[in-house]
Amino acid sequence: MRIAMVASEAAPFVKTGGLGDVMQALPNALSKLKGNEICLFLPYYKRIKEDPAIETEQVGSFSMELAWRESYVGILRLKPRRKKLQVYFIDNDYYFGARSTVYGDFDDGERFAYFSKAVMAALYFLDFKPDILHCHDWQAAMTPAYLRALYHDWCPQT
């Protein structure tokens, strides 16, 4: 089963509360079950970008519209690659990479709407058609809406 997991935090990369712990344990546990292939998507926050222990490689980039703004979307993959669990980061300095905070900015709604739409665009770019789209907390809540509105024909089984 192909499972795309979308969250705003996951230990050890970034953790502000219990969600970070869950998102460290759950993808790892699911990846150990026979037949599962997991992709975890996280924002590429400044603290992740600046952590020398986290090594990534860019696997793609493109532009994406969000309302009135045309925005860069970078897709980075955690190195080294693992067979059944891939960790991807959505890179955009305006929304994530230049800020020292994870939450609490005046434009969090816009930031995470961008993140949700960028995850769907990244899944399409990577041609990873999930059987399950597992979205965690409000920051990822718009991802299924973008799936239905923009990517249903590409991925109707999800």
Residue ranges, per PLM feature:
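Catalytic cores of nucleotide-sugar-dependent glycosyltransferases that transfer UDP/GDP/TDP-activated
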Residues: M1-T158
